[in-house]
């Protein structure tokens, strides 16, 4: 049976200019998204506390869907089921969300919340289709010959998330969107550099195979028996260098964000860049060990994220990463006026009040990063099987 269009039934008071209260259904749906993330993706839940509510609420709906999509593909693989069928099921849920009809799935609350967010913020379907395309590449067991091939994958599974987060923050400029996608790709490359051994033991190889051959490593022979050596170290270093270059470019995009949004994005930027630094400190060996950023350093980085709200100098514009171009074009294009959309005002909260509010919870926010290190990807998001 068809349900009420969630885009109308879920007036998200955190993102609209009117003071219309949330409907009971909206309250229940958003509460379920937040609860799911708190249990299944505590790192995101904690980091999201550094974002203003106007971004945190819709971001929770988007991220809950992203995690559910990831879990659906992983669970299909673990259960011996067809991963491609899982991706097809996710596309059906997107069809429902973009048509304004919640999909009759086990996660109806997330579907309804997603439908409301994509309608209210006019998030192009191209972005979520690209995300699912990346999951489809994982389902194929695809490996990547060149850096450009790997960046195309990272653009789909992470650059898309950066673009959507930018839209939630009111960013529609090509430059701002390009930097948001850069951050997503950089974070994905950091994860890949950190998880080389863990991925290999699960039969996955993300390192560019051209780079491996240039280091005198046969990719498939190494994958059959992954070992750390000087060749692997050189490839990991090259990947970290690429990621670091992208992190440095992101500053131009952060400067375009509303003031209240900058601490959360800076936190992600600093913490993920530090993963690469920690890999380097450990001799670039991400085969026999998994780099973990010490808690004290996380606190220091978070403090920097809270303080560095204003750009220290004008960042030089950089060209859009070719792998991200289609995302930027899709997200920046609009055929009509978007002035009805609300975005967090950069002047809504004085910077000193933002710092005080964030600093009060900074140490608590760090704790989940430490406890969940290395465990988050294994924790499925629990969602009630029937809508509330």
Question: What are these model-predicted stretches?
Answer:
Residues 2-186, 193, 198-388:
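Catalytic cores of Mg2+-dependent Asp-rich isoprenoid enzymes
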């Amino acid at each position: 049976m068809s349900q009420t269009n969630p885009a109308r039934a879920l007036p998200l008071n955190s993102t609209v200019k009117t003071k219309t209260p949330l409907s009971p259904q909206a309250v229940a749906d958003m509460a379920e998204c937040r609860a799911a993330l708190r249990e299944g993706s505590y790192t995101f839940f904690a980091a999201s506390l550094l974002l203003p509510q106007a971004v945190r609420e819709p971001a929770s709906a988007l991220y809950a869907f992203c995690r559910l999509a990831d879990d659906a593909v992983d669970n299909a693989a673990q259960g011996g089921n067809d991963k491609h069928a899982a991706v097809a099921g996710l596309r059906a849920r997107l069809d429902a969300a973009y048509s304004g009809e919640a999909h009759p799935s086990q996660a109806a609350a997330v579907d309804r919340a997603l439908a409301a967010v994509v309608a209210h913020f006019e998030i192009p379907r191209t972005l979520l289709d690209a995300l699912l395309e990346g999951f489809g590449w994982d389902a194929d067991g695809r490996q990547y010959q060149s850096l450009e091939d790997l960046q195309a994958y990272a653009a789909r599974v992470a650059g898309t998330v950066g673009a959507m987060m930018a839209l939630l923050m009111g960013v529609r400029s090509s430059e701002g969107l390009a930097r948001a996608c850069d951050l997503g790709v950089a974070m994905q490359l950091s994860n890949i550099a950190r998880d080389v051994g863990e991925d290999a033991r699960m039969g996955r190889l993300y390192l560019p195979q051209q780079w491996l051959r240039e280091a005198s490593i046969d990719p498939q022979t190494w994958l059959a028996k992954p070992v750390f050596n000087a060749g692997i170290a050189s490839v990991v270093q090259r990947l970290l260098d690429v990621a670091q270059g992208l992190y440095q470019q992101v500053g131009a995009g952060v400067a375009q964000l509303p003031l209240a949004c900058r601490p959360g994005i800076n936190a992600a930027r600093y913490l993920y860049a530090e993963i690469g630094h920690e890999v380097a400190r450990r001799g670039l060996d991400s085969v026999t060990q998994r780099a973990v950023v010490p808690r004290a350093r996380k606190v220091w980085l978070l403090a920097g994220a809270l303080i560095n709200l204003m750009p220290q100098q004008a960042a030089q514009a950089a060209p859009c990463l070719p792998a991200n171009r289609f995302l930027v074009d899709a997200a920046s294009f609009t055929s009509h006026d978007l002035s009805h959309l609300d975005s967090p005002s950069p002047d809504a909260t004085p910077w000193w009040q933002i710092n005080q509010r964030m600093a009060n919870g900074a140490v608590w926010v760090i704790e989940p990063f430490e406890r969940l290190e290395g465990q988050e990807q294994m924790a499925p998001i629990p969602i009630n099987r029937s809508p509330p």
